[in-house]
Amino acid sequence: MIITTEKETILGNGSKSKAFSITASPKVFKILSSDLYTNKIRAVVRELITNMIDAHALNGNPEKFIIQVPGRLDPRFVCRDFGPGMSDFDIQGDDNSPGLYNSYFSSSKAESNDFIGGFGLGSKSPFSYTDTFSITSYHKGEIRGYVAYMDGDGPQIKPTFVKEMGPDDKTGIEIVVPVEEKDFRNFAYEVSYIMRPFKDLAIINGLDREIDYFPDFDDYYGVNPERYWPDRGGLYAIYGGIVYPIDGVIRDRNWLSIRNEVNYIKFPMGSLDIAPSREALSLDDRTRKNIIERVKELSEKAFNEDVKRFKESTSPRHTYRELMKMGYSARDYMISNSVKFTTKNLSYKKMQSMFEPDSKLCNAGVVYEVNLDPRLKRIKQSHETSAVASSYRLFGINTTKINIVIDNIKNRVNIVRGLARALDDSEFNNTLNIHHNERLLFINPEVESQIDLLPDIMAMFESDEVNIHYLSEIEALVKSYIPKVVKSKAPRPKAATAFKFEIKDGRWEKRNYLRLTSEADEITGYVAYMHRSDIFSMDGTTSLCHPSMNILIRMANLIGINEFYVIRPLLQKKVKELGQCQCIFEALRDLYVDAFDDVDYDKYVGYSSSAKRYIDKIIKYPELDFMMKYFSIDEVSEEYTRLANMVSSLQGVYFNGGKDTIGHDIWTVTNLFDVLSNNASKNSDKMVAEFTKKFRIVSDFIGYRNSLSDDEVSQIAKTMKALAA
């Protein structure tokens, strides 16, 4: 890289001038080798990788260079390129002239913009991290080894061996930097960060993460991350493959910053100046001017491309959806520039009036969801509830599909239930293109106001997916799946008075029960009560804070039962009078209290935050029981394991109820468990540190996963036993 230097001559009439000089000293070498860099690990990774890229450019070698990321099996950071290599003179010079590795500001790349380097500092960057590293050169039939080290007089280089290249040896340079164990993860992160612009250039060994490689692009690359992104929002220059922030230079409002959260902009080599550390740009007047002009040019280009694309769009709905996803600033920028959209030349306000759901759509019909327990929902301009379908969710711009059913026959609830059953059958030919939990808008053909709204709905969803079926058509397809209701002579309830949950084929299934009060004796076993959407105990004192059938299933699994009932108000009094059912809340409370009483106070295992992520998994998987010795001095009892599993299963389950209620009893047990675990955690952090140090691979693997597969559990057990042997 050509480094631009500006010269300005100031004339005077004084005495003879004298040149400045720098005295070579350990202090100077320390400044140039270590103090120059703020992020020392990134400096080592960046400089050695870019040197390899330059080496391959030097002899036009398209082969991939090799990076070895340090780890427990090989604690070295290794960079091996397949460039031309270097001669002994190139590396260490002679008595009259120093080489590239034992001199500063000496570079072979300063006269060309074809290379990334140019300051003559990068090859010495390992000294910012370590006092010694090795160099091996494969050049003109010889392999020469060197060790570079720092002593009291500054950096030194010493030859270690010379031998002939073998038939399989290739020219190039190999740099080996020893790495401390505590820095393994940092080196891995920096490799994944620095390599993003260099896709398909390297073979990377030992890296435990994916690299978010940049795609191929000519001018700029915009990103709106939906997950963690290593660069904070703003503008970044990519110069010589290195990413530099340039937000501080740009003051004016620009489309790139509005359009994308993060923007990477390529700059031609030679157009910017960089600091010697290459950690930042050198923001002189020329560099600032080039940055401002480049951002302005690309911002205008990007804006014109977006405007052109929007104007050529034939779908107002898709265009409006994209504008809504852009956010307020982008929409405001376009409106302020009087942009018109689509081939219909629509304004933003016109599209807004076209696609924001009107209140009249609340009269379009009723809604059911495709599941085994379909419930009627009325359409309202409000938030979603168990009885309300929000018009914004049903018709809004982010909805890309609508299923319309012409309600031409009776029995829609059973037909929807039959459809849900059919969709569970892998052999069912789903020509309807309707899927589980999708919404069905039922339009009554005899209600003129609903039929009149059908063209408006179809116009709203132009270019999106609109499925229209007659209910009779759906019935014909799912007839064999529709549940048969055996009618009793007595009048049946209009809605389910109970729900039965039972395990079939290894999974929980829910079935509606339409029972009269006189038939309440058919219900036996474990029950919970339900009123509206609330779920509570038989005595009525305790309810779930966040009512969910899944929580009841979790409670049933803890108790160890394979069926239970949820009773609605019509049957509750009679079921209680019969006395043949047990409350599932009470059963859980009794089991929980018994499990707590079975564990002696001195048998608790410390649950510090650092140990928790390991202990939770060890308790969950019996095959890993032997590992508990690394986190607890005492042997973990079966009673403690049982209690800890119950506590873990009840995480996130909260109960309403005052003192002397089932919910309060359950809360008390959980609270006491936490207190006793915290009291036992005084040695926990120390044991975790020892485990992490001794078993780094297993620690990293197990510590950052929410769950483990059976194969992973077996592999961990096998690895631990081998390492501990």
From Swiss-Prot:
Compartments in which it is found: Host cell inner membrane
Gene Ontology biological process terms, A to Z: DNA replication
Induction note: Expressed in the early phase of the viral replicative cycle. rIIA RNA is translationally repressed by the regA protein.
Single GO MF annotation: DNA binding
Keyword Membrane listed: yes
InterPro entries in UniProt: HATPase_C_sf
Keyword 4Fe-4S: no
SUPFAM superfamilies: ATPase domain of HSP90 chaperone/DNA topoisomerase II/histidine kinase (SSF55874)
Annotated region of DNA binding: 544-570
Approximate repeats: 101-179, 481-559
GO cellular component: host cell plasma membrane; membrane
Main function: May play a role in viral replication since found in complexes carrying several of the enzymes synthesizing deoxyribonucleotides and associated with DNA and host membrane. May be required for maintaining membrane integrity during the process.
Name used for this protein in its record: Protein rIIA
Organism this protein belongs to: Enterobacteria phage T4 (Bacteriophage T4)
Phylogenetic lineage: Viruses, Duplodnaviria, Heunggongvirae, Uroviricota, Caudoviricetes
The encoding gene: rIIA
